[in-house]
């Protein structure tokens, strides 16, 4: 690798940049799918001994990766598993005890055992009103692993929480910055600056997330230079100026 002589560490650079600017670093990991190992919904494709060996190797790789993330970069604010992390009793990687042992103050989101925060039920940057931080379950699951009540009425339980819930599971309202005008793109592509949300949309998201007792997570991703596009940066600064005015 030519970049930094093959000795670069993107996670280190990211965490250092966060700390430099007073931002608590969090890490987003995807372990539900892996094309190299042929993994779909946490399971390696195939059957028999070969499948079992590949599944064991994949689990070992994932658990090693999570251990590395939890030990090399100091305290983390949150680890977010995209699509969750399945239950180890189903043969999936066992990541919860690793995070809890090595990052005891880090928010864990999420598997079929625990969710210390919850997805807000859409990728619109908003939640419903009212929105309670209390919840009926201490996990949210995903797909078929989700508790039966979660998917009812358009994910109403995720969008509103439960005023009588006994678990503290506050909502996160996520949206990609480049999600305007019929586009919904979490990753950078050239020539789609027209799909950056206008300021009035971003302000509306703020009022309907932070203003409704949720955290707004706005998706920005680097371009092919490794930096955040200037147009994206300027638009988020406009939002910040409006909110702080």
Where are these regions (language model features)?
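Mature catalytic domains of secreted/periplasmic carbohydrate-active enzymes
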Residues: 1-245
């Amino acid at each position: 690798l030519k970049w930094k002589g093959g000795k670069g560490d993107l996670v280190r650079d990211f965490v250092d940049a966060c700390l430099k600017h007073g931002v608590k670093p969090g890490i987003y990991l995807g372990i539900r799918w892996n094309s190299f190992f042929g993994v779909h919904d946490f399971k390696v494709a195939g059957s028999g001994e070969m499948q079992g060996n590949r599944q064991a190797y994949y689990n070992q790789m994932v658990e090693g990766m999570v251990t590395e993330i939890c030990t090399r970069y100091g305290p983390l604010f949150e680890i977010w598993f995209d699509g969750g992390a399945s239950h180890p009793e189903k043969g999936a990687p066992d990541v919860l005890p690793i995070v809890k042992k090595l990052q005891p103050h880090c928010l864990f989101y999420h598997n079929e055992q625990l969710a210390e925060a919850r997805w807000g039920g859409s990728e619109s940057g908003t939640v419903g009103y009212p929105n309670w931080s209390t919840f009926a379950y201490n996990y949210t699951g995903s797909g078929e692993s989700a508790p039966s009540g979660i998917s009812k009425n358009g994910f109403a339980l995720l969008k509103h929480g439960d005023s009588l819930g006994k678990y503290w599971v506050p909502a996160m309202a996520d949206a990609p910055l480049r999600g305007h005008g019929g586009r919904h793109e979490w990753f950078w592509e050239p020539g789609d600056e027209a799909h950056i949300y206008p300021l009035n949309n971003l302000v509306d998201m703020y009022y309907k997330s932070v203003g409704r007792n949720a955290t707004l997570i706005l998706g920005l991703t680097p371009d092919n230079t490794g930096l955040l596009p200037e147009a994206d940066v300027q638009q988020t600064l406009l939002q910040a100026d409006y909110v702080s005015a």
